Amino acid sequence: MKENPAPAAVGAAWQVVSVETTARTQIKDITREIAALVKQSGVESGVVHLYVPHTTAGILINESDDPDVARDIGDALDRLVPRGAAYKHYEGNADSHIKASLVGVSAVAPIEGGKLGLGRWQGIFFCEFDGPRQRQVKVRISRD
């Protein structure tokens, strides 16, 4: 019986994409940066793992064709979790922690034919909730 080899990771470590935000709440499209890493990897079929190592930021995959969608997401989160409400955390950014918890800090996308296998209208967004700041997204590309 032939054994299937374990999936090989591309590179020994996570790669880092730097993200500079310019507003306290900002939903920033980083699809191009991630797509460039996928292309550089040479992986034809696999998975890209994305992780945000911050407690007041997150990552999501959603519509990227209309920039109003990203603005609507940020505005909706600001309405759902307003800044300055009576939170127990007293550093002034409790709302940012809650928003990051709702959005999440990780995402996974397929690699198909050497490219990101996102849906037609999908993009990858870094979600800043306590900016402006210099942030990171950790990226790991694995082949099937």
For the regions a protein language model found, what residue spans apply to each?
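Active-site histidine-anchored catalytic micro-motif
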Residues: M1-D144
